Each structure stands twice: as structure tokens, then as C-alpha cells.
Amino acid sequence: QNYEISAGGKGLRVTTARLTDIFLEEAERGASCIELVTPGHYTRQIREALLSAKAQGLKLPVVYNSNAYELPETLRMLDGLVDIFLPDLKYFDSRLGEKYSGVSKYFEYASEAIRTMFAMTGPARLGDDGLLKRGMIIRHLVLPWQWRDSCRCLDWIHETFGDDVFVSVMNQYMPIYKACLHPEINRPLTTLEYQKVIRHADEIGITKGFMQVGKTAEAKFIPNFNGDHV
């Protein structure tokens, strides 16, 4: 859904000083957090901007939103600066990562990265307002024909972290961009496929979880990447 910025090269040049200002401006607008989306390739600049913003009074929780295909040493550069991690666990079978995402050893890298994230934040902790203030929400998008792999992802999450993390099981897959190159996923997810995964989450005892209801796989939910406030 985000191919426009992830593969299309769309974006704006921003200096580290301007990024610091953006963080502070978002706080002034009443944002509940600072969310960094797929930020790994700008880690050094983000670290510098966060240090500067926090020195100028930034108090908002910082959220690191990632596909989890990351190196632990990169993540540790932000130790003490990130409060919440939102990693995806896309595949248990790394062959699916090679096929659909063009990356090798996806699960090996992602699982180690997610462990590192947990070590940096510890168990999930909610504030008095009911919002997550520290910890991790691990997200998983169920793909057509891959509900068994989804169940294996949930098994690993629950066996590794128990109730110390939140889990979000998503049904919002949309067959766009290069999905046409893979006929088996060039269709929406069925309700039955999604229900099988949700049922499995319940059976293995996941209690801190989110599920999606209604029609979420629609174009209206794709953000307008127009660079507002940048």
C-alpha cells in the first residue's frame, strides 16, 4: 500500500535541523507521539535530531515503525531514545520473504531484530489515558493462501514474549503494485482465511491482541503522501 514512497522514490529533502523542528512542531500541534516509519536508513540523522529535540523539551513517546528487517547494531543506536516499537513480522518461512519481498533470511533477521527491540523497551506499559507509553506491538498482515505461515508467526511471538507484547493481526492486504506478478496473492484475503488465524491466536492464548473488522482493504485507507508539515 505504501509503494508510492517505498519504491517510487517520492519524498522531500529534510536537514537534521529541520527534522528537529518537525518533532517539536508536532508536539505543539498536540500529537500523542512521534512516529518514525521505516527509518532505519536515516538512523544517524534521526538520533541527532531526537537528541536535539529532547534537549529542547520534547516529551512525547517516540515510536519506531519498521518491517523488522534490521540489524541489531542499528537499532541500538537509538537505545534510550525510542519508547515504542511497531515491527512487522511478515513471514515465518523465509522463502516467502525471498519470493514476495526480495530479501534473504527474512525471519532470521526479523526475529533477532524484534528480540533486540524488546530488550530496549521491556514489557508493554499503558498510561493512565489507556495509550501505550512503552513496549512493543508486533504486527502481522495475513496474506492470501498463507494463513498457516501466519499461525506459525503467532506461535513464535507468543512462545517468545508471552503477554509482554501486544499483537496486531491485520486483514488489510490489497493486491496492488507488483501483486500481479504472483497470481496466488493477486486477490483480496478471504474472511475464512483471516478467521482461521484469529481463531488460532485465541487457541494459543494470546490475550493482548488487536484484530480488524469491517472492510479495511480499501484505497481510502492509503495515506496521501503529500509531505504536509514537512
Where are these regions (language model features)?
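Conserved glycine-rich "GG(E/T)P / GGGxP" loop and the immediately following alpha-helix
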Residues: 27-52, 97-99, 105-106, 115, ...
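Anionic-ligand binding region
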Residues: 97-129
